């Protein structure tokens, strides 16, 4: 169901979120 999908999204953000933020900051500062 959609709740499972939502939980997967949260787990993915926990793992990938910091890396994505760092990449975005790098792109913004160039």
From Swiss-Prot:
GO terms for molecular function: toxin activity. Pfam families: Ponericin. It is found in: Secreted. Expressed by the venom gland. Its main location: secreted. Shows a broad spectrum of activity against both Gram-positive and Gram-negative bacteria. Also has antimicrobial activity against S.cerevisiae. Has insecticidal and non-hemolytic activity. This is M-poneritoxin-Ng3c. It comes from Neoponera goeldii.
């Amino acid at each position: 169901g959609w709740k499972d999908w939502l939980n997967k999204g949260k787990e993915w953000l926990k793992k990938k979120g910091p890396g994505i933020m760092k990449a975005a900051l790098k792109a913004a500062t160039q």
